[in-house]
Regions:
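Long amphipathic alpha-helical segments used for membrane anchoring, targeting, substrate engagement
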Residues: 1-33, 108-134, 384-412, 436-437
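N-terminal low-complexity, Ser/Thr- and acidic-residue-enriched intrinsically disordered segments
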Residues: 1-72
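Auxiliary, metal-adjacent structural segments of Zn-dependent hydrolase domains
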Residues: 58-175
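Post-HExxH zinc-binding segment in Zn-dependent metallohydrolases
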Residues: 137-158, 206-258, 272-299
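A short mid-domain helix/strand-loop element embedded in enzyme catalytic domains
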Residues: 163-178, 249-267
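Short pre-active-site segment immediately N-terminal to the catalytic Zn-binding motif
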Residues: 177-195
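Active-site recognition of the HExxH zinc-binding catalytic motif
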Residues: 190-210, 344
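Pan-zinc metallopeptidase signature
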Residues: 262-438
Length: 438
């Protein structure tokens, strides 16, 4: 922050001080965050979508929903469509970002206050409140920069795998879609339709799996809150970083927040929440990848190229996702998308569409991270048994009636009995023992 000749930029300095003094609720000043995000978006042209673009999005989503009817047991979850500018994406998703960001903001403000020595807290008095407000404004500036960067890249409302928009609203960002299409050897219409298929598939899943939205957002907030965090380790880290920080100097406060404040050792609870989030994100994205692949297999020649482009984009992330990862402390990208897509496809091949989609009935039924290690083996033992001929059935029945049972089992044996046990034997009896007297 500086003006001509190395002099401070007084307008910017006074603007920061004024923002700190403005009252706001919660741990983060969202007015500052949104203002920062809008300014970041305004650095490049951001025209409002034309009526033609709005109609194109609506038509693409309508066709996408029709194609998806043949590939999933879930009915349409789309109740409205929208073509957003980048600024409109900010407005349309900010309420969910508040849910995601505020826990980590509150943790940060509280940790900074508690990191001060007891004597310093007693001597600071009202200054502690000012420090908290200053940190809230600095965090808001970082959040705004991160959201502004994301707004310049996102393609749809569900592009990061989380339900960021209103329930049932399928939204695309035409300006970003066109920029994405420019780097592919695929027509813009095909790119729009493919992305509409993905958006409509997300909407179906979130609409008809009622627990999924809270499950995903809950994993994010559980991570952000740092459940069972090592308070001593964090306090030591913050105390180390706060040495030399002048609460009256906005630049020193900014350096504190940019100096790896969020790069702290993860607690076991945070590691568990992160694994749950990454696995569920991969399962959501893998399911979308699978059903869209089915829907386009015989209808869209460019689908394979689009699928690979989207997979690479989601797996690698970009500058915007890196910015947000450094801000919140986690990455919203499905690292195991390919494994998850393979798992869903294998389950459909063996047991059918309804069995594949039925896994979403309850979170306890979802594949685990270990299941993604062997995607072809998920529920392998639940595959439909091979048909048996009438003659084979008669032969097996004859063996049973003749007492020709495998391994020396006797009629009336219970699961876990040893060969040669007598009816009524108790666990631990020796072979040949009779019933244990009462």
């Amino acid at each position: 922050m500086g003006g001509p000749g190395g002099m401070p930029d007084l307008n910017q300095l006074f603007g920061q001080i004024q923002a700190m003094m403005q009252p706001y609720d919660g741990p983060l000043n969202w007015d500052v965050a949104l203002d920062t995000a809008r300014k970041a978006v305004a650095q490049q042209p951001d025209p409002s979508p034309t009526q033609r673009q709005k109609d194109a999005v609506a038509d693409a989503v309508r066709l996408a929903d029709h194609w998806l009817d043949d590939t999933t047991a879930f009915p349409s979850g789309v109740t409205s469509t929208a073509a957003w500018s980048r600024a409109e994406w900010l407005v349309g998703t900010v309420e969910v970002w508040k849910v995601l960001v505020e826990p980590v903001a509150k943790q940060t403000v509280d940790s900074l206050s508690s990191a001060l020595p007891e004597e310093a807290r007693a001597a600071s008095g009202p200054l502690l409140g000012i420090i908290g407000k200053a940190v809230g404004v600095m965090l808001a500036s970082q959040v705004g920069s991160g959201l502004g960067a994301l707004a310049s890249e996102v393609l749809t409302a569900s592009d990061v795998g989380l339900p960021l928009g209103a329930a049932g609203r399928a939204a695309l960002v035409p300006a970003n879609v066109e920029a994405f299409a420019a780097g592919l050897d695929v027509s813009t219409d095909d790119v729009l339709l493919y992305l509409a298929l993905r958006e409509a598939a997300h909407q179906r899943l979130f609409a008809h799996v009622p627990w999924l939205r809270e499950h995903l957002l809950g994993a994010v907030t559980a991570y952000a809150r740092g459940i069972e965090i090592n308070a001593e380790a964090i306090q030591s880290r913050i105390e180390e970083q706060m040495r030399g920080v002048d609460p009256t100097d906005p630049e020193s406060m900014q350096r504190l927040l940019e100096g790896g404040l969020f790069d702290m050792p993860k607690s076991p609870a945070q590691e568990a929440a992160l694994l749950r989030l990454e696995t569920t994100l991969a399962l959501v994205e893998g399911w979308v990848d699978e059903v869209v692949g089915q829907a386009t297999a015989e209808r869209m020649p460019a689908a394979a190229k689009m699928q690979e482009a989207v997979r690479r984009r989601r797996a690698a992330g970009g500058p915007a996702e890196d910015t947000f990862a450094s801000l919140v402390g986690l990455e919203l990208r499905p690292r195991r998308l390919r494994d998850a897509s393979t798992l869903w496809g294998s389950l459909r091949t063996r047991q059918g569409t309804e069995a594949r989609d039925g896994v979403w009935m309850h979170p306890d039924l979802l594949p685990s991270a270990a299941d993604l290690d062997d995607p072809l083996g998920f529920r392998e033992d639940a595959a439909a048994p091979a048909e048996i001929s009438e003659s084979d059935f008669d032969a097996e029945l004859a063996k049973l009636l003749d007492g020709d049972l495998p391994d020396g089992d006797q009629p009336g044996d219970q699961p876990g009995d040893q060969p040669g046990d007598q009816p009524g034997d108790q666990p631990g009896d020796q072979p040949g023992d009779g019933p244990t007297p009462a």
